[in-house]
A protein has these predicted regions:
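Cytosolic catalytic regions of ATP/NTP-dependent phosphoryl-transfer enzymes
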Residues: 291-432, 439, 452-453, 461-473, ...
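Transmembrane helix-loop-helix hairpins at the membrane interface
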Residues: 21-101, 107, 211, 215, ...
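Cytosolic catalytic regions of P-type ion-transporting ATPases
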Residues: 65, 96-210, 493-503, 507, ...
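Membrane-cytosol interface motif
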Residues: 92-109, 116, 278-297
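Membrane-embedded transport module
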Residues: 227, 266, 483-532, 547, ...
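Actuator/coupling domain of P-type ATPases
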Residues: 2-6, 10, 16-26, 74-75, ...
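Helix-interface capping motifs at the ends of transmembrane segments in multi-pass membrane proteins
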Residues: 46-68, 218-254, 271-277, 602-622, ...
């Protein structure tokens, strides 16, 4: 290495003072101020404030009780998200990329965020380039597909530029950082994308909630204005009665707890995953996890342990100093993958003094590494079937038994030709086969149990590896993966159509290139599958990035950890069932809780529209709805969101929620409308009609909660029982403040009739909804079969 000097401590401090640090322009998590602002300064909190002012102006102090719920909702949201932020920030620091940096003449490890401009840094295979740099020494091959989309190895020699966001596929080099932080290439690309309006895609659930919130937000203002006009100037109610009724109607239409529950549930889920040593880089991936039906895994580091052991070489030629050749080949090197590390540990300690005049580092594209020792000869180590090519039959008798044992096998050969520049496939005719180098990984003890879990959950496993397909198939079968006997050599899949067909039919894929891994992910996604991809190597980066959910092992290549949405900090594949179960738990419970919230919103919206069209006043006061909301929606939804739920999520979020919420919302609307009709027909006082309506929707709400709690568990019994006591107890204890009035004989008869009708009405609407849902699904299935 030429004389290279790094920065001194004083120079580092000077650059920090000048702001020339590699700090990212924006933190991965929100700041404390952003969390407080986003929870306090919301559109609906502004609406609640305006409604409270309206109530204050007419001295309706008791009906301002909903502000207490708003306050506690906001406080809970802030506290939970701050807790999640602290946990995620700690894990982010633990998982941050560390690089070798030359400072004060000494090599030391420095976090990528702590680098400064002009730092001298060493990059190896699997490292992501942390900032723009220029190569000072060494040679490597970079992949810039993450920033340019072009998936090819680009040689980087002395003087070449390294772009931030790219990663090294092979080799090792020393470089000086030229542009850091916001000035780097990757940061400028991100800033331009944000300036053009591009944002990280939100999950289907959050997009659905955003649309619902926007619709309600737009509808509130005209409905509220017309309600005030109708009730005060047309029905000639007093201003206090008008404001009370209008505020109640608008509060009924606002899903005040739904968005909060969703945000808090996702934040808590990130925190729960963090406690399991799983770093979540993107909150949206939690929703994706709940929908995963296909899991793509690598063999090494996932099914097997990441560390490999090199066995004794099997000579193929007589009187050849195999150990001496291997000692020279691996002596003094810096291995950049598990295979090289195992061979270096076994053979590279002897220190045979052969000087290499040219070195080709291993690359997944051509699957060999080579060293030219001049007079001592040129030697290559790589995949036997790839190197031997048309001569592979000469190795079959010795190679096949090893592959059947699940071994990884490399070929050591002498190359009598000239090494290609740039690296490319070698001429098999120029090879002298010297030895087979068998290596082995132990299957992780937890692997069979983990794969049984996924099989039980209906998740298909696809094993995608760069190794020989027969060897991978043997390992997969021993790990208990169903369909492991269905394997294919990806080298034979010469078209996208052939690869797409194999993606559906086969379980094990061997000799897969990094680009083919990505194509396999795309093929599975094109068939409608939600794909999670696990990996730890530089050859997994492209597939991890394009999978619906990329899951990286922290012990693997830094580039893999940087592009994945989830990082297993313990690098333990056994953690995955818990990760998937957490995703399903939170999304299923949010979906179930959302159906409770929307019942109130649906019936209140329909009732408001009817109140505008007919000579009927809105029958509720804000405090009455607050009691019903607490007992049948808010409190039970919170507790239901905490329990386990491992069911695979199917269908669209909003469609699923509306299918559950519409029967309840329509039941409330029909019964309340009937109560108003009876009141209008029999001249029942408005306060008595309001009491009847409150008791009716409380009863319907408890029936809906009963349906949600099926099948009943001790927790479900506790939730339903306590909410029933809270609702009924609130009616008796808070009647004076709600206000609820004593019913006369006519009012009592109306209440009894409506309560008697509530259960059959709800059951009938649920039955009709399920029948309609089934008919639509049958029609879709028939239509799909016609197109097959």
């Amino acid at each position: 290495m030429p004389s290279i000097t790094g920065l001194t401590a004083a120079e580092v401090e000077a650059r920090r003072a000048a702001g020339q640090t590699n700090q990212p322009p924006k933190s991965q998590t929100k700041t404390t101020g952003e969390i407080v602002r986003d929870n306090v300064c919301t559109y609906f909190n502004l609406v609640f404030l305006v409604l409270a002012v309206m109530l204050a102006l007419v001295h309706s102090w008791l009906n301002m009780g909903f502000l207490g719920i708003v306050f506690w909702n906001t406080l809970i949201g802030i506290v939970q998200q701050l807790r999640a932020k602290r946990t995620i920030d700690k894990l982010t620091l633990v998982s941050a990329q560390k690089l070798r940096c030359l400072r004060d003449g000494q090599w030391c490890e420095v976090l990528s965020d702590d680098l400064v401009q002009d730092d001298v840094v060493e990059f190896g295979a699997g490292d992501q380039i942390a900032a723009d740099a220029v190569v000072l020494d060494g040679s490597a091959q970079a992949n810039e597909s993450l920033i340019t989309g072009e998936a090819r190895a680009i040689p980087k020699e002395c003087g070449a530029e390294l772009k931030s966001g790219s990663f090294l596929m092979a080799g090792r080099c020393v470089a000086r950082l030229t542009r850091v932080g916001a000035e780097s290439y990757a940061s400028r690309l991100t800033a331009e994308a944000q300036a053009d309006g591009h944002r990280v895609a939100r999950g289907e659930m959050m997009r659905s909630l955003d649309k619902l919130i926007k619709f309600i937000g737009v509808a509130l203002i005209p409905i509220g204005a017309v309600l005030i006009w109708k009730q005060h100037w047309v029905l000639e109610l007093s201003m206090k009665e008008t404001v009370d009724a209008t505020v109640a109607a608008l509060i009924g239409m606002i899903p005040e707890g739904l968005y909060l529950l969703t945000s808090v549930a996702l934040a808590v889920s990130m925190m729960r995953l963090a406690r399991r040593k799983v770093l979540t880089r993107d909150m949206n991936c939690i929703e994706t996890l709940a929908r995963v039906d296909t899991l793509c895994v690598d063999k090494t580091g996932t099914i097997t342990e990441s560390t490999m052991q090199a066995d004794d070489p099997l000579p193929l030629a007589e009187n050849t100093p195999i150990t001496e050749i291997l000692s020279a080949f691996y002596a003094g090197g810096q291995p950049d993958n598990d295979t090289a590390r195992a061979l270096t540990a076994r053979f590279g300690q002897g220190g045979t003094a052969w000087a290499a005049v040219r070195t080709i580092p291993f690359n997944t594209a051509y699957k060999y590494s080579a060293k030219d020792f001049g007079a001592q000869g040129c030697y290559v180590v790589g995949a036997p079937d790839v190197l031997a090519g048309s001569r592979a039959g000469e190795l079959a008798d010795r190679l096949t038994p090893l592959l059947a044992q699940g071994r990884r096998v490399l070929l050591l050969a002498k190359y009598n030709g000239t090494l290609p520049d740039p690296p490319a496939a070698l001429d098999p005719a120029q090879l002298e086969f010297l030895a087979l180098l068998p290596l082995q990984n132990r299957i992780r003890e937890s692997a069979p149990k983990t794969f049984r879990f996924f099989a039980k959950q209906g998740v298909k496993i696809k094993v995608i590896s760069g190794d020989d397909p027969q060897a991978v198939s043997h390992v997969a079968a021993n790990a208990g993966i169903a369909g492991a006997e269905h394997w294919v050599d990806a080298a034979t899949l010469q078209s996208e159509a052939a690869l797409a067909e194999a993606a559906e039919k086969c379980t094990v894929f061997g000799r897969v290139t990094p680009e083919q891994k990505r194509q396999l992910v795309h093929a599975l996604q094109a068939k409608g599958h939600t794909v999670a991809m696990t990996g730890d190597g530089v050859n997994d980066v492209l597939a991890l990035k394009d999978a619906d959910c990329g899951i990286a092992m922290a012990s693997g290549a830094q580039a893999a950890s940087q592009v994945a949405q989830l990082v297993l900090l313990d690098s333990d594949f056994a953690a995955l069932p818990g990760v998937v179960a957490e995703g399903r738990r939170v999304i299923n419970n949010i979906q179930r809780s959302a159906s409770l919230f929307l019942v109130k919103n649906i019936f209140s919206f329909l009732l408001s529209i009817v109140a505008l069209a007919l000579p009927l006043a809105y029958p509720f006061q804000p405090l009455q709805l607050s009691l019903v909301t607490f007992a049948t929606i808010g409190a039970p939804a919170f507790f239901l969101a905490l329990e386990p739920n491992h069911e695979l999520v199917h269908g669209k979020f909003m469609r699923n929620v509306l299918r559950k919420a519409l029967p309840g919302g329509l039941t409330d609307f029909l019964l309340v409308f009937c109560a108003q009709g009876f009141g209008y027909a029999f001249d029942i006082p408005s306060d008595m009609v309001g009491t009847i309506c409150t008791l009716v929707i409380l009863c319907v709400g408890l029936q809906i909660l009963w349906g949600v709690c099926i099948p009943f568990t001790p927790l479900h019994w506790a939730i339903w029982g306590s909410m029933t006591v809270a609702g009924v107890g609130g009616v008796f204890l808070l009647a004076r403040w709600l206000p609820l009035v004593r019913l006369d004989l006519g009012g009592t008869l109306v209440l009894v009739v409506l309560l008697a009708l509530s259960a059959p009405t709800l059951a009938g609407l649920v039955f009709m909804g399920e029948r309609l849902h089934g008919m639509v699904n049958d029609w879709k299935n028939k239509k799909a079969r016609k197109h097959v």
